[in-house]
Swiss-Prot record:
Catalyzes the facilitated diffusion of 2-acyl-glycero-3-phosphoethanolamine (2-acyl-GPE) into the cell. The keyword Coiled coil does not apply. Residues 39-52, 112-144, 188-226, 278-280, 326-343, 388-397 are cytoplasmic. Residues 1-17, 74-90, 166, 248-256, 302-304, 365-366 are periplasmic. It comes from Escherichia coli O1:K1 / APEC. Belongs to the major facilitator superfamily. LplT (TC 2.A.1.42) family. The gene is lplT. This is Lysophospholipid transporter LplT. GO terms for cellular component: plasma membrane. HAMAP family: MFS_LplT.
Length: 397
């Protein structure tokens, strides 16, 4: 069935504003909840290697539900899917507030996030189109990164004051996102009437994976974004252990401040990409990807706070410039071939598989006692080499 798309090309339509507000509040809750829950694990004396496990159960939900969430996003009005997904996040955060095992509560938040992602990105192609799609992605990424900036800091600072207050603030953010979703126009479903047989859905998802992988442009985008987000999540957890070792600071807030520097940088980089990169010139983003790994390596050797702030902001600028064009490329090409929701679901599978793999390797490295600074050096070097290999591969094909 052909994809039905209802577009309003304005970047500041009522629907777009509602999407951006909902995304900000939802992402704020995600990031505040991570650091609040990490503080809870520390307070309850969980081992250090369990910290990345928290994120692994979150991304495990993405992988488990990947064959189904794309069809959900394309079979219903995406604004309503976003509202349901934020409701699941609210339930997960509330369960942690009431003393349920934090890993179980965070898994429920992961299920909500898995359902939310294809809808939030897929709806951009229904609210705007053509040359403005990259700019719409820039707005979405800027909103997300602003939420990462404020949410991460709020989670760490509030947790230093009172962990329960931090957890309640996360639940309230998710509640606000549910309300914002109400104001998103109820657009027609992109691909209604598809089979809900689980075997058929899995087969359809695998067909979408195959279709996107066979296309050189979407394959390039999938690999690039997967490497970036896998590395980004690993860096976040590396900072939690790096700060007390390299800087001698043991509070919950400092790692969140450092993460905020990355967030600020990504806002700048996303804005630059929206102005300087088009769907026809996506390869311009590749040098920035290589430099991310180089700067991470240099950062790992620092022992002063000010250079650490500056280098992390630079990593963010490079990251924003690298990932925004790749996201836009996948949405535009994927919308035409397998549907925007399915394209983003396939992207989520790739990104979260990369996260799971990188976090697993990182957790294992911590468990066997490798010092955090050598971990950071090796991590940066491997990332730079991986993006270099991807660029060479893309140019040859």
């Amino acid at each position: 069935m052909s994809e039905s798309v209802h577009t309003n090309t304005s970047l500041w339509s009522k629907g777009m504003k509602a999407v951006i507000v909902a995304q900000f509040l939802s992402a704020f809750g995600d990031n505040a909840l991570l650091f609040a829950t990490l503080a809870l694990l520390k307070a309850q004396f969980y081992p250090e290697w369990s910290q990345p496990i928290l994120q692994m159960v979150f991304v495990g939900a993405y992988i488990l539900f990947a064959p189904f969430v794309g069809q959900v996003a394309d079979s219903f009005a995406k604004g309503r899917v976003m509202m349901f997904a934020n409701g699941l996040k609210l339930l997960g955060a509330a369960s942690i507030c009431f003393g349920i095992n934090p890993f179980l509560g965070y898994t429920l938040v992961g299920v909500g996030a898995a359902a939310y992602s294809p809808a939030k990105y897929g709806i951009l192609g229904e609210l705007t189109t053509g040359s403005k799609l990259v700019k719409a992605n820039g707005l979405m990424e800027a909103s997300t990164i602003a939420a990462i900036l404020l949410g991460s800091v709020a989670g760490g600072v509030l947790a230093d004051w009172h962990i329960l207050v931090a957890l309640v603030a996360c639940a309230l953010a998710y509640g606000g996102a549910v309300v914002a979703n109400i104001y998103i126009p109820k657009l027609a479903a992109a691909r209604p009437g598809q089979s809900w047989n689980l075997i058929s859905m899995t087969r359809s998802f695998l067909n979408a994976c195959t279709s996107l992988w066979r296309n050189g442009e979407t394959r390039f985008s999938l690999v690039g974004t997967s490497l970036f987000w896998g590395a980004g999540v690993t860096l976040r957890f590396l900072l939690v252990l790096w700060v007390p070792v390299a800087l001698g600071i043991t509070d919950n807030a400092t790692p969140t401040y450092l993460n905020a520097m990355v967030a600020i940088g990504i806002v700048v980089g996303a804005g630059a990409a929206a102005k300087l990169v088009t769907l026809e010139t996506v390869s311009r983003c590749m040098p920035a990807g290589i430099l991310i790994g180089v700067v991470v390596l240099i950062f790992s050797l620092q022992h002063e706070l000010l250079p650490a702030y500056a280098l992390l902001m630079l990593i963010g600028v490079l990251g924003g410039f690298f990932v925004v064009p790749l996201n836009a490329l996948l949405q535009e090409r994927g919308k035409k071939s397998v549907g925007a929701g399915n394209a983003i679901a396939v992207q989520n599978l790739g990104e979260n598989s990369a996260m799971l793999l990188m976090l697993g390797i990182y957790s294992l490295a911590v468990m066997v006692g490798i010092p955090v600074v050598p971990i950071g050096i090796g991590f940066g070097a491997l990332f730079a080499l991986a993006i270099t290999a991807l660029w060479i591969w893309q140019r040859r094909h």
